[in-house]
Design a protein with these regions (language model features):
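Loop/turn elements at helix/coil->beta-strand transitions in domains of secreted/extracellular proteins
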Residues: 1, 27-31, 73-78, 112-116
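Conserved SGNH/GDSL esterase-like catalytic core that processes O-acyl groups on lipids
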Residues: 1-67, 87-103
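Conserved beta-strand termini and adjacent loop/short-helix elements that scaffold enzyme active sites
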Residues: 4, 81, 118-120
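Sec-exported extracytoplasmic/periplasmic mature domains
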Residues: 19, 36, 67-74, 106, ...
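Alpha/beta-hydrolase-fold catalytic nucleophile elbow
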Residues: 34, 79-82
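Extended, compositionally biased low-complexity polar/Lys-Gly-rich tracts
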Residues: 54-78, 113-114, 154
């Protein structure tokens, strides 16, 4: 398993790692891509020029990652996950931005060979769109319960890989 997501400007960092040896020598059947939320609120003491990206810019970066993955590992299926809900309440700016990103991604990826889009964020929310108790400590980073739900939501794709 290789985790390509790190703090910072995610698409640029992932593209750099893909171009510099990440995933070399392995041929996964399935790649699960989740990226983009960090770009909604970039702040850095090391680089004050960093600014938040728009949903369109984030989608552009994600599409570049998908293109690079398809070229690097042409036989792999790429499951692109929608940006998870973020922020304490529905209707907040991060929730709206995530919904926009997910809508754009779903449209762009529709019909793309070996690429599937899945918006599984609702597994973390109650019927009113609020995070369920114990899923996250800060309305962004998942706790154990959140990771369990994420893993369970991936079961249909993981079972098809075996």
């Amino acid at each position: 398993m290789s985790v390509l997501d790190r703090l910072g400007p995610v698409p640029v960092g992932i593209l750099w790692r893909l171009d510099n040896g990440e995933l070399d020598g392995i041929i996964p059947k399935l790649i699960v891509l989740l990226a983009g939320t960090n770009n909604l609120n970039l702040k850095s003491k090391l680089d004050p020029t960093l600014k938040a990206s728009t949903p369109d810019e984030i989608v552009e970066g994600l599409l570049a990652i998908i293109a690079r993955l398809r070229k690097k590992i042409p036989t792999a299926k790429i499951l692109t996950l929608g940006v998870f809900p973020r922020g304490p309440k529905p209707g907040g700016r991060f929730r709206i931005a995530a919904e926009k990103i997910n809508s754009l991604l779903a449209e762009w990826l529709k019909g793309m060979e070996r690429v599937e889009f899945a918006d599984i964020g609702k597994v973390f929310l109650d019927g009113d769109g609020n995070f369920e108790e114990g899923v996250t400590r800060d309305h962004l980073h998942l706790c154990d319960e959140g990771f369990k739900r994420w893993r369970k939501a991936l079961d249909p794709w993981l079972k098809n890989v075996r």
